[in-house]
Amino acid sequence: MKKLFVLLAVLPQFICGQDLLEEIDLETSENFETAAFKGLKVVNFESTKMVSEKELYFVVSHRFGSIKTGIEDFFGLDQAVTRLNLIYGITDGINVSISRSSFQKTYEGALKLRLIRQKKESFPLTIVWHNSAQINTSLDEDNLPGLEFKHKLGYATQLLVSRKVNEKLSLQLAPTFFHNNLVSVTEQDNSQYALGIGGRHKLTKRWSINVDYGIHLNRAATSPFSNPLSVGFDLETGGHVFQLHFTNAQPMNINNFLGQATGDWSEGDIFFGFNISRVF
C-alpha cells in the first residue's frame, strides 16, 4: 500500500461581475466535460476544479465549535475557527495558494496542477495533483523543550481523480500521503496515508449536495481521532458561491482534518461551517 501511495505522490466569491453559473456551464471548443464540482472543495477535500488563468480567488472558510455544547457555547459560536485563503491561476491548469488558519495558527502554501481533463467520448477522468506545506506556529519551545523549527512543519500530496458521471452526479477519489514532523500521539507514524472519497449530486440549477469521507489507513490504535465525514450544500447565486456543511472535523488543512478530527457523528459532536468565495 505504501508503494502505491509513493507512486501516486511522485506523479507528475462575495461579489463579482459575472454569474459563475455561466462560467461553469460553458463548454469549451475541445469538448471537455465541465462543472464536475462547483467549488474548489468537495467539502473538506480539494476538488478537481481549478482557478482560471489570471483569476484570483479569496476564500473565507469558517467552522463553528461543536454544536453538542448547546447553549453554553451558543451551539459552537464561541469556539470558531477561520481560514483565509488566496488562490491564483497562473494558467488554467496551474494554481498556487497561500492561507492562514486560526487552528494552531497554521500557515500553508500549496501548488495544484491539472494533469489531464475528462473529455466527452474520449478520456473518462480528470486528474489533478495537489501538494501543500504547512507551518504550525502555535508550538512553543516554553511548552516543548527542544522544539526546533523543523518540528512545526507538515507536508501533504494528493492525487485527485474525478469523473462527471452525468449532468447531476460527479464522483472523486483522493489517495493522500501526509507527513507531520511532530505528532501528538506517540505511537502515530509521522508519515500517514489516507483515501478520500467524495461526490456531488446536483439538486437544482443552483443547489447541490456534496459528501466526502477520509479513510485513514495507518492510524495508531491509541489515537483518539476519527475519520472525517462531511456533508454539505453548494449554493450559487449571482457572483456568490456559498458552501454550507456539517462535519466531524473542525480544522481545514489536509494534515489536520485527516489527522486530528475530534468529532463523532453518532454522538452529535459535529461542527457547522461555511465557505464563501470572491473572484477577482
PLM features per residue range, with description:
Residues M1-E22:
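Bacterial Sec-dependent N-terminal signal peptides
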